[in-house]
Amino acid sequence: MQQQPSPAELLVGLAPSDDAAVYLVAPDTAIVETLDFFPPIVDDAYASGAIGAANAMSDVFAMGGEVLFALQIAAWPEDLSMEQLETLFRGGVDKVREAGGVVAGGHTVIDREPKYGLAVTGRVHPDRILRKNALRVAMRSG
């Protein structure tokens, strides 16, 4: 992706990339934003929704954040039932709720292959952001 000028408020962006973007909105509050989606990895629609939601939210958690809300994104074949899609969405909604967040909307398109995921918005204190390039293995004695 082409590099672009970044505002000072963009604490984590493309260079170097990490699990999610982080944007400072107040001295003690930064927004964590991520998007993940992929084809189902299990046959159960509810489990697929829960797995997709957990995967997307894990990027917010990896940055040290808490989940606020999410938007679902799905690609759905016309030959699969709407009931299966609703079950998939229910799995995602339940998993986001379990993490303390809420699903606030989303978007669905017709495609040949099913895909599902979420854009997740979280919050973190700027002093508590966890970065991949700053991780250290804990030393253990004894």
Q: PLM features: residue spans?
A:
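N-terminal glycine-rich phosphate/pyrophosphate-binding loops that anchor nucleotide-derived ligands
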Residues: 1-62, 128, 135-142
